[in-house]
Amino acid sequence: MDINIDKYKNITRNLERDIVNLNPIQRGGILPTEAKKVIYEYWDGYSVCDYCSGRLDKIETPPINEFLDDMSKFLGMDITRPTHGARESKYAVMNAICKKGDYVVLDGNSHYTSYVALERANLNYVKTDVEEYPNFRVIPKSYAEKIDELEDSGKNIGLILLTHVDGSYGNVSDVSKVGKIAKSKGYPLLLNCAYSVGRMPVDGKKLNVDFIAASGHKSMAASGPCGLLSINAEYEDEILKTSKVNVVKELQMLGCTSRGIPILSLMASFPHIIERVKNWNLELEKTRKVVFEFEKLGFIALGEKPRNHDIIRFETPVLDKIAEKDKRRGFFFYEELKKRGIGGIRRGVTKEFKMSVYGLTGMQVDYIIDCIKSIVLENAN
C-alpha cells in the first residue's frame, strides 16, 4: 500500500492551551477537569458496555440509567435518551411522528441540520418570518399564519419546530408564545436547544414543549459526538418504539447511540453543568459589556438588544476599512489577534465576525476588550 502514515502520528492541538478561544460553537463544549479524568477510563471502544444487558439507556455501571432520569428532571421533561447530537434528535422525532410528505413549520433562523433532518425523513417545510435587519428575531405570530395557510390549502402538518437560540445571531426565541400557538392548533412542538441546554436554564414544562433536542459537544461540556433527546411521556410509544426483530432495541436510536467517551464525558460534566447555568446572568453581563465596548469602536452588534445569549455577531466596517490598506488584507485581524494569544475568529474575515466569551473570567474578558481596542486604534490611522 502506498500510504504515508506519518501524518497520523502525534496529532496535536494547542488552541485551548495556548490561546483564548472565542469560537461560539466551541465555548460551551469545553470540558471541566473532572470530565477529562474519565476519558482515561473509557477511551477503549466498547468500554461503556462492560455490564450492558442489551440497551444503553439501561446500563447501571456506569450509572447511565440514573443519569438519563436525572437529566429529565434537569430539563423538566419525562424521558431522555442519548443521541449523537441535536441533529439526530430532531431526525428521530420527525421520522417517528410524521408521515411521508407532511409539513414541518419551522423558524426562519433554523440551523441547516433542521432542514437536512426533515429532508432525510421525506418531509416538506414552511419557514416562518423573522424581523428585518438588524434584529432578525423570530416572529411568533408568523407560526399561526403559516399553520393557517397550510391548513387552508389542505396540507398535512406533522410538527412545529422552533430554534431556541439560533447560531447566526444568538437570539432567544419566545418559546412560550410559539408553544401556546402549537398547542391551540393541536400540533407537537420540537425545541432545538443546541445552543441553550447546558449554557442557560431550560425547563421544557414551563416552556410548553413536547420535545427537546440538545447538543452535548456544543453546549454541555462534552466530547463529540453527543446529544440528547428529551420527550414528554405521551409520545413514548411513538418515539421509543422497539424493533420487531430485536424487541429490546429502540428503532429511532438504531439500538444504541452515543457510547464511550462522549456519553461518559457528558455524565462527568453534569454537576458542572448544573452549577454553571445558575450563573447565566453573569454570562450575560460579560456579553453585554463586550457589546457596549465594541460598539464604541464602530462595531455593529446584530440581533436583539440587550443581548440575551452569549453568541455575538458584529458587523465591522472599521476592520474592513483597515483591511483595504493593510498588505495582509483580510488576514490582518486574525494575525493581530493571534499575536495577542486570541483565537477562534475565522481567518480572512473583516466584514463581520461571531464570538463568545462564555465561561471566560472577568480578567480574560477585559483582556480581550483591551486587545481588540488596541488593534483597531493602532491600525485605524
Swiss-Prot record:
Homology family: Belongs to the SepCysS family.
The keyword Transferase is annotated on this UniProt entry: yes
InterPro entries: PyrdxlP-dep_Trfase, PyrdxlP-dep_Trfase_major, PyrdxlP-dep_Trfase_small, Sep_Cys-tRNA_synth_arc, SepSecS/SepCysS
Reported function: Converts O-phospho-L-seryl-tRNA(Cys) (Sep-tRNA(Cys)) to L-cysteinyl-tRNA(Cys) (Cys-tRNA(Cys)).
Binding, pyridoxal 5'-phosphate: A86, R87, N192, S215, G216, H217
Residues recorded as bearing N6-(pyridoxal phosphate)lysine in the entry: K218
Gene Ontology biological process terms, A to Z: translation
Reactions listed under catalytic activity: O-phospho-L-seryl-tRNA(Cys) + hydrogen sulfide + H(+) = L-cysteinyl-tRNA(Cys) + phosphate
UniProt xrefs under Pfam families: SepSecS (PF05889)
Keyword Oxidoreductase in annotation: no
An MF annotation (GO) of this entry: Sep-tRNA:Cys-tRNA synthase activity
Cofactor field: pyridoxal 5'-phosphate
Protein name in UniProt: O-phospho-L-seryl-tRNA:Cys-tRNA synthase
Quaternary structure and partners: Homodimer. Interacts with SepRS.
EC code: 2.5.1.73
Entry keywords, A to Z: Protein biosynthesis, Pyridoxal phosphate, Transferase
